[in-house]
């Protein structure tokens, strides 16, 4: 018996919406990354993008375990001398773009190549309870 290999014409993608209220960041991110890759499907093929489209709402209401909300620090560099910048998870969540916390966590769990960037494009994270993807008729996905 030959191994199954998914073709682009046979891949079926569904739309799911997840309410992130009171969900732990890492546990939510690992489940979403698995679904973006398509590893929950029996037709999973490692070199094909066979995952689903995910919409996450209420991204500002996620929670961290322990004291990570104050201790976790995100770093980046401006590429100028002395340009190391940082922000804590608490400031990021209470700032203008709280959805970036979830995006960074999920992006770190995807492959670091062209396929991973293609998978990441199927993720839509919003800070409120509204999203503009009602035309796709997403299914509610309960995690945990």
UniProtKB/Swiss-Prot annotation:
The alphabetized UniProt keywords are: Ribonucleoprotein, Ribosomal protein
The family database entries (SUPFAM superfamilies) matched by this protein are listed as: Ribosomal protein L13 (SSF52161)
- Tell me the Gene Ontology biological-process terms attached to this UniProt entry: negative regulation of translation; translation
> Matching InterPro entries, A to Z?
Ribosomal_uL13 (IPR005822), Ribosomal_uL13_bac-type (IPR005823), Ribosomal_uL13_CS (IPR023563), Ribosomal_uL13_sf (IPR036899)
User: NCBIfam families per the record?
Assistant: rplM_bact
Record note on quaternary structure? Part of the 50S ribosomal subunit.
User: What is the role of the protein in this entry?
Assistant: This protein is one of the early assembly proteins of the 50S ribosomal subunit, although it is not seen to bind rRNA by itself. It is important during the early stages of 50S assembly.
Q: Please state what the protein is called.
A: Large ribosomal subunit protein uL13
Species annotation: Magnetococcus marinus (strain ATCC BAA-1437 / JCM 17883 / MC-1)
